[in-house]
Amino acid sequence: PLNKDGSICEPEAEKMLDTAIASGVTYIIDTAYPYHNGDSEPFLGRVLKKYDREDFFLATKLPVWNVNTLDDTKRLFQEQLDRLQVEYVDFYLLHCLNKEKWQKVLDLGLIPYFEEMKAEGKIRYFGFSFHDDYEVFETIAMGFLSDSV
C-alpha cells in the first residue's frame, strides 16, 4: 500500500506483512535497493526484525548500474544486509541485466565475489533478473552455469 505521494503507507504495509506471515505465507518479500525511492529495504528491515529469520524468504537485488568497482559492490551488498537487518538473503539477484550490464559484471569480477558470499552463508541462492534479447539471456545463463553459481 502506498500513500498519495507514492511513499510506503507503513502502517498498512506492516499490517499486510503481519497478516501474510500469520497466515503461513513464507515467500513474501521481493525487494531491491531502489524500490520506493530506496525506502523498501529499510522499511522491511524494521518490520521483519520482529520475526524469526527462518519464518520468511527474502529476495533483493544489486543495482548493477550503481556500481563501478568491486569495492562499490561489497559496500552496497553490506548496506543492503544492514538496511534489511538480516545476516543473509535467500535470493540475491543482479538486477535488470542486459548485454552492457552483463559485461560490467564480468569486468568487475562480481560472480566470484557473490560465490564467496554464498560460501559464507550471506546468500542462499544467487541469480539475475533480465531485460534484453533471448541471445543475451543465453549468454548470461551459460555464464552462470559455467561458473556454478
PLM-predicted stretches and their roles:
Residues 1-55, 113, 119:
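N-terminal binding-site loop/beta-alpha segment at the start of enzyme catalytic domains
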Residues 1-5, 57-63, 93:
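N-terminal small/glycine-rich loop or linker at the start of catalytic domains
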Residues 8, 65-149:
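Glycine/proline-rich, positively charged
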Residues 30, 61, 90:
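Acidic active-site catalytic centers that drive phospho-/nucleotidyl reactions
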